[in-house]
Amino acid sequence: MGIQKDTKIRTLLHAFELVGARVVLFLPSFHVEGFITRIGETFVTLRRGNGAGVEVESNDSGQALENPHQISVKISDIISVSDDRGA
């Protein structure tokens, strides 16, 4: 099941990278919003765009946790992928 999920997540990541859309990656305790700059074998890297930082927010409270210039997350930790509308 893990390999199949990772393959689906990776397919979505490549689609967002291809169109250059801002993406939201949901992980168990937080989510991150930004633009994909690199999809590696096990990690995906997001960067800020248009002068805004990568947004890292708590899933429980929605509170901002940090605003780094870029962040890398492990693909196997990603629960879901979405656009940034309404996130």
Q: How would you label these PLM feature ranges?
A:
Residues M1-A87:
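Conserved RNA-binding domains used in RNP assembly and mRNA/RNA metabolism
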